[in-house]
Amino acid sequence: MGLSFDKRHGMTVPLWNRDKISSIPDSDLATIWIMLAKVLWEKNIVGQNFNYDRDKLRRLGFSIKRIHSDTLLKAFAINPELPKGLAFLTSIYTREPYYKDEGMYEGELRDLFLGCARDSCVTLEIDEAMDADLDELGVRKFYENFLMQLPDFYLEIENNGFCVNSSKRDALIEKYIEWDERLSYEMFEIAGIEVNSNSHLQVHALLFDEWKLPRRMGVGEEELTALLNLKNGVKYPPHRAWIEKCLEQRRVRKTISTYLMAIPDYDGKMRTTCFMCLETGRTSTSQQNPPIRPLVDTVGAGKKTDMKVMGTAFQVFTKHGDIGGDVRSMYEPEPGYVFVQLDSSQAEARVVFNLATDEQALKDIDEHDYHALTASWFFGGVESDYSKKVLGYESPIRFAGKTLRHAGHLGAGARRASTELNTQARKYKIPITIHEGIAERALKIFHAKQPRIQQVFHKDVIECLKQNRQLVAPLPWGIDAERGGVRIFYERWGDDLFREALAYLPQRAVTDNTKAAGIRIKRKCPDARIILEAHDALLFAVRIEHLDEFIPLAKKEMERAINFTNCSLPRRYLKIPCDVEIGENYKDLHKFNIRVIETPEYMRTPKSITEQFMVQE
């Protein structure tokens, strides 16, 4: 364990006296462990991505009372776009030469001890050097009072995980292997040869050398979708069918290898690893890559190719389409618990309307099926023709209206909008495709119907970029800070920069609001188990008998107002409605209607003499 109480001095404390690690006597080693436990509990701890270290310390029996500072989160508060690893931070905040290649991981034990002590010293030095930048940007309170609350929140997510229904999982594996074999046979019938859909070389040779289709730079999903979108790109229907089956088979095989065959943790639960510091403010999840968990030999022969990582990424379990729903169905809460999902309703769209000062749109979104209404602008008809409430399912036209609206919010052009729509439709098996002409016409109608999005929101964001290339996000409710998260943009001037900047404020506002709500809910309901944070939604496991108490409180916290007063685009406060769903697995979630309990007669306010004699209709 590396310790440093001063940036000029550090030490490494061996925790074992076996395998030539140290020659410390057992009695002294026991005293050292007691002293370390006291230091970790009593002192303010500074670390780099300290949730990783804390997990290892917890498994050794050590407890941390308080993380005083985390240089990874501090780097995120200062510059979300720059790398946040210790090596990079050392290079820009200290004069310490690069030392990671001096045998720390490949050399002798002494080299490892020296490297560990150096890590401790430079972490402390970096933390002190960052304070000036933190104060200059005015985000110290935001960092201390909000960002530093996130490690505890995400540590619980990583520790909880899903229970896996083995019988459902086995049935899904059988279903998807049959699906994969069927697609292989159908593709062989069309092409006349066996082609591995995951081999880009084989797919490239078939499409461009054998079939002479218009050449693309690659054969990934985006390139093949663009090829299918060309008016005269794929003229022969069997060729089109083969490409679509190729894309479908890739998704099926990824589902088998990455999700259905994922390795649970030692207690049988499926867990994930959270990364809190994407440049937009959002989080991502991934497998439990080493050294978080060791690789598992799935065959037992000791071959490197048979080694597999534990866990899986949770946030990719989309509820759209059949594949996402299938994967969700095998995940369940512990016995006696049910899942409660809190989902902010059309959150990013509401933030965009507020930033565009479009009060009519904020009113209409509560009174209409807004995606169906948007679809009627583009494709004719009326809202009820495509309404999800009327039809009972999502119409392909409604899906197109929703996707094109999101493209319009973020200033996308016709090509990007059509490619995104066709890619998503194919992924979720929604029977609709459009070409650039339809997308261009739809975007023109959209901006004519809602001109304030371009004239106010887009214009004001670009003006902020012209001033200092900096945007300040709104502030979640209950955070003691002057301003929200700050991002400095380094992309070169142009459409890519504008697209990133337009997406930042809505995404950061929504994700910070969700995280802050989750922290408040956990503080008030410590027995509820947080399973997942997914940008605009939270998933909890709650005891069945506590549902009536938990849901009204959680819904209230999710609907707290977001503060836009010190945002780069100052606006009024905004409340985002929250939909509540419950279920016994992650797929079959249904709406939960909060019961309204009338006030008992003895608690009601007594009527006046006049009210008692008035006629009640």
Predicted segments — roles?
Residues 1-19, 81, 92-93, 98-101, ...:
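Conserved "right-hand" nucleotidyltransferase catalytic core of DNA-directed polymerases
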Residues 524-579:
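C-terminal structured "cap/appendage" subdomains that terminate the fold
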Residues 35-39, 322-338, 523-524:
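A short acidic-Thr-Gly-centered motif at the start of a beta-strand
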Residues 1-88, 92, 300-302, 319, ...:
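Conserved RNase H-like, two-metal-ion catalytic cores of nucleic-acid enzymes
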Residues 43-53, 194-197, 343, 416, ...:
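Short glycine-rich phosphate-binding loop at a beta-alpha junction
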